[in-house]
């Protein structure tokens, strides 16, 4: 390993996960300080070391093209709103049809069923953290968020140009009220929402899990299991079956699309790819004076 005798600085997307690629945060304050120091450090590497470093620390999809000083990201657009696509046309990487084909071919996979958002009484992290209603702060350039439900509904309002409802959503701290406000978005078009909703939830969960170490490690600990929102009520984001139902264990009998579970699996894949070598970094370099 060419880099073994060097203090390895983490790439920007690992050093300050709360700052997006094109955020002004890289041009002021601690973000600017880090990006300059990182650039100076990168210049000390030989061509061989730089190639090795790049292989060890691939860009996340949200920084696609950064190593080549290009913008290779693709977006879905509607008016002034846009969201990054992870897969062509923003389609899910995993689907119920894919899983049913896996099961039909005899490739059964472990299922990890979750539902509900309340923390455990002993303070231990449970599968509730996978819920859209789980309270955990995360940030984007646009705003801070207290849960994924708030992020999704604020994006929904922004998608349809309803600034008033978006502002109300961002000021609200009750998940139930946030969901109700999301239903009041003016100019709503179901076809447009269906095109954008998965990409919105995918990106929001990337922010949520990439910025929170404990959640990130718990998600990665689920391995390659199929994540399943066992909501007995939701046929879009869940399977419309309770975890206690025998049918919940059989994807052939699911009554819902499980879009949330599949989005979380896609986030898990990307986290694993991007963070697999972060233990090699010298984290003391992030806040070095």
Model-derived regions: residue spans:
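Charged, low-complexity intrinsically disordered segments
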Residues: 2-289
């Amino acid at each position: 390993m060419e880099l073994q005798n060097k203090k390895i600085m983490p790439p920007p997307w690992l050093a300050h996960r709360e700052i997006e690629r094109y955020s002004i945060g890289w041009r002021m304050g601690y973000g600017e300080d880090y990006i300059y120091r990182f650039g100076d450090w990168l210049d000390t590497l030989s061509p061989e070391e730089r190639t090795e470093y790049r292989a060890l620390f691939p860009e996340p999809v949200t920084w696609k093209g950064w190593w080549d000083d290009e913008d290779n990201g693709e977006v879905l657009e509607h008016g002034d709103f846009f969201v990054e696509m992870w897969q062509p046309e923003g389609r899910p990487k995993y689907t119920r049809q894919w899983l049913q084909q896996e099961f039909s071919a005899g490739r059964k996979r472990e299922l990890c069923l979750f539902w509900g958002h309340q923390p455990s009484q002993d303070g231990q992290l449970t599968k509730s953290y996978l819920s859209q209603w789980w309270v955990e702060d995360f940030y984007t350039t646009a705003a801070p968020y207290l849960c994924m439900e708030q992020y999704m509904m604020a994006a929904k309002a922004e998608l349809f140009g309803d600034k008033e409802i978006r502002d109300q959503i961002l000021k609200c701290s009750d998940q139930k009220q946030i969901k109700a406000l999301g239903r009041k978005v003016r100019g709503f078009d179901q076809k447009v929402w269906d095109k954008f909703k998965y990409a919105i939830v995918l990106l929001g969960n990337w922010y949520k899990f990439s910025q929170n170490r404990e959640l990130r490690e718990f998600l990665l600990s689920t391995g390659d299991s199929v994540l399943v929102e066992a909501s007995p009520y939701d046929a879009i984001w869940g399977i419309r079956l309770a975890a206690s139902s025998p049918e919940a264990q059989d994807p052939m009998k699911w009554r819902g699309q499980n879009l949330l579970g599949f989005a979380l699996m896609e986030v898990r894949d990307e986290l694993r790819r991007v963070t697999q070598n972060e233990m090699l970094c010298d984290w003391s370099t992030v806040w070095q004076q």
